[in-house]
Swiss-Prot record:
Family matches, as InterPro entries: GlpE_sulfurtransferase, Rhodanese-like_dom, Rhodanese-like_dom_sf, Thiosulf_sulfurTrfase
Recorded family membership: Belongs to the GlpE family.
One BP annotation, GO: glycerol metabolic process
Native organism: Serratia proteamaculans (strain 568)
Start and end residues of each Rhodanese domain: 17-105
Name of the featured protein: Thiosulfate sulfurtransferase GlpE
Keyword presence, Secreted: no
This protein's GO CC annotations: cytoplasm
Amino acid sequence: MEQFEAINVEQAYSRWKDGSAALVDIRDPQSFEAGHTPGAFHLTNASLQTFMQQNDFERPVMVMCYHGNSSRSAAQYLLHQGFDAVYSIDGGFEAWARQYPQDVETSA
């Protein structure tokens, strides 16, 4: 995969539920703490190396942001770091929380 692929929240939810892809959330710390998908890795500049060390580059990665815009550049960046398949979630966390409110947790 040379270019990331955009997927909708239904596709992302299915992959998240069956565990076939890693989920990273690139929103700011306050937004992440206020609500995020269970098991999502909070990916920041500071946590990037940890994520890369802990994850198999052959396992698909889904990138979530606020609305599905910022995730596109982050997805492309992860591809350039060597991940085989990276997906940007259209609609981002806002769409996820609207469609799957039961699958949102807080850090508080």
